[in-house]
Amino acid sequence: MKKVLILGANSYIGNSFQKYIGENYNDQYEVHKVSLRGEAWKEDDWSEYESVINVTAKVHITNERFTEVEIKEYNDINCTLACEAAVKAINEGVGQYIFLSTMSIYGIGDSKKPVVVDESTKPNPQNPYGKSKWKAEVGLNKIFQNNGNKQKTKLVIIRPPMVYGEGCKGNFQTLVKLAKICPVFPDYPNGRSMLFVDNLSEFMAQVIKNQMEGV
């Protein structure tokens, strides 16, 4: 049985993944969770885990202007913590470190200027969330390339779009409420990618099962 550690005790994606595994792969995976708040996690022993999934993040953006304190918080949570956790995973011989990044590293589009992403699209983050996640990706790649990685820990970076499902937060719930109360829904083409949380959970399960690496 593969042992998996989720970094982020209150993450929607992390909680959904744990529930999905319990319902579909209960005999194949043992999933634990830990919070990265404070310093206690640094004393934990991760050597027993096959994979560590980092879903800790500061995500929701409700304004267009950010203070220096807010920007620092994005960087501290989304980048610095991610890199510190990766170093711990490597040093303790974890087989695989999975980092949940975001499609926001490619920029934020709108109806007048959509951002179409394919394999050749270059990162161009436009807000503190996207910038901090991209900074984390760059930092993680340097860590895995430059420190010797004697234990051969594999790095996986996943860049999901907006994730929806039961109990999700963000804009999707607003759309659901609108659809329920509006008798006539406009015929408007959707240009935004969305991913059902169970599909993301299944993908992560396969990534762990096959010990994959890369973006």
Each predicted region: which residue ranges?
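N-terminal Rossmann NAD(P)H-binding glycine-rich loop of SDR-like oxidoreductase domains
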Residues: K3-G22
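NAD(P)H-binding glycine-rich loop region in Rossmannoid oxidoreductase-like domains
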Residues: E39-N91, I105-I108
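Glycine-rich NAD(P)-binding loop of the Rossmann-fold in SDR/ketoreductase-type enzymes
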Residues: E73-L81, P123, N127, K131-S132, ...
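Conserved Rossmann-fold NAD(P)-dependent oxidoreductase catalytic core, especially the SDR/UDP-sugar
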Residues: C83-P128, G148, V156
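Conserved beta-loop-beta element that borders a ligand/cofactor-binding pocket
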Residues: V138-E166
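Glycine/proline-rich active-site loop of Rossmann-fold NAD(P)-dependent oxidoreductases
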Residues: Q151, V163-T174, V207-V215
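Glycine-rich "substrate-gating" loop/helix at the edge of Rossmann-like oxidoreductase active sites
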Residues: P161-C168, D187-D198
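A conserved pocket-lining segment of Rossmann-fold NAD(P)-dependent short-chain dehydrogenase/reductase
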Residues: K177-L195, Q206-V207, Q211
